[in-house]
């Protein structure tokens, strides 16, 4: 009888004086999402993250939006990162590394990931305006910093060029999504081994 593959899912509930957030992810999904953060542009970006990574995501976030969006965006990144880390488990059999150059109209952005267990963000992205609509562009970096730190991944994001700030932000999310899609995939040639000569990624 064939063995049933272990479920690669993770759920996190996080409550502080500033936010209340619940996140569930399925690494072996189809990119379905149910997202509500109260921040419209951020919801749109998270939908792109789920759809292009093929990671199913359910995200419900309530935060102190009467102050600003910062706590909600950062804490959502923390919770998604923790949920992904749970879903990865001991990271046996994963592809681990991936990178992609992603184009959108006039914009080109590169994302490279290593699901190493060692959190690090290299951010080389510049926006030409402080806001996209009402959304603070500096929060894009804050989100990815929180995601990388709590998922235990090394993440490099480089915007090669682009003129439209919406496109720059969106290519960051889409490029990271596509890199995660590849890096989290199970490589049958690994035969369940941890992809590291150290024997551990946690």
UniProtKB/Swiss-Prot annotation:
<dbReference type="GO" id="GO:0005737">
    <property type="term" value="C:cytoplasm"/>
</dbReference>
<keyword id="KW-0368">Histidine biosynthesis</keyword>
<comment type="pathway">
    <text>Amino-acid biosynthesis; L-histidine biosynthesis; L-histidine from 5-phospho-alpha-D-ribose 1-diphosphate: step 6/9.</text>
</comment>
<dbReference type="InterPro" id="IPR020565">
    <property type="entry name" value="ImidazoleglycerP_deHydtase_CS"/>
</dbReference>
<keyword id="KW-0028">Amino-acid biosynthesis</keyword>
<dbReference type="GO" id="GO:0004424">
    <property type="term" value="F:imidazoleglycerol-phosphate dehydratase activity"/>
</dbReference>
<keyword id="KW-0456">Lyase</keyword>
<dbReference type="GO" id="GO:0000105">
    <property type="term" value="P:L-histidine biosynthetic process"/>
</dbReference>
<dbReference type="InterPro" id="IPR038494">
    <property type="entry name" value="IGPD_sf"/>
</dbReference>
<dbReference type="Pfam" id="PF00475">
    <property type="entry name" value="IGPD"/>
</dbReference>
<keyword id="KW-0963">Cytoplasm</keyword>
<dbReference type="InterPro" id="IPR000807">
    <property type="entry name" value="ImidazoleglycerolP_deHydtase"/>
</dbReference>
<dbReference type="InterPro" id="IPR020568">
    <property type="entry name" value="Ribosomal_Su5_D2-typ_SF"/>
</dbReference>
<protein>
    <recommendedName>
        <fullName>Imidazoleglycerol-phosphate dehydratase</fullName>
        <ecNumber>4.2.1.19</ecNumber>
    </recommendedName>
</protein>
<comment type="similarity">
    <text>Belongs to the imidazoleglycerol-phosphate dehydratase family.</text>
</comment>
């Amino acid at each position: 009888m064939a063995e049933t593959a272990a479920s690669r899912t993770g759920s996190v509930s996080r409550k502080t004086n500033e936010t209340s957030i619940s996140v569930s992810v399925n690494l072996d999904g189809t990119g379905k999402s149910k997202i509500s953060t109260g921040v419209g542009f951020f919801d749109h970006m998270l939908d792109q993250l789920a759809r292009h990574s093929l990671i199913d995501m359910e995200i419900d976030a309530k935060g102190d939006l009467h102050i600003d969006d910062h706590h909600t965006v950062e804490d959502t990144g923390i919770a998604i990162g923790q949920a992904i880390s749970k879903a990865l488990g001991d990271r046996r059999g994963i592809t681990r590394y991936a990178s992609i150059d992603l184009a959108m109209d006039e914009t080109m952005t590169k994302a490279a990931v290593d699901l190493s267990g060692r959190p690090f963000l290299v951010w080389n992205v510049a926006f030409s305006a402080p806001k996209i609509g009402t959304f603070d562009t500096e929060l894009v970096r804050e989100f990815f910093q929180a995601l990388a730190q709590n998922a235990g991944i090394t993440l490099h994001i480089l915007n090669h060029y682009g003129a439209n700030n919406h496109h720059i932000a969106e290519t960051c999310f889409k490029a990271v999504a596509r890199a995660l899609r590849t890096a989290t995939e199970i490589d049958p040639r690994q035969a369940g081994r941890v992809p590291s000569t150290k024997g551990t990624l946690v």
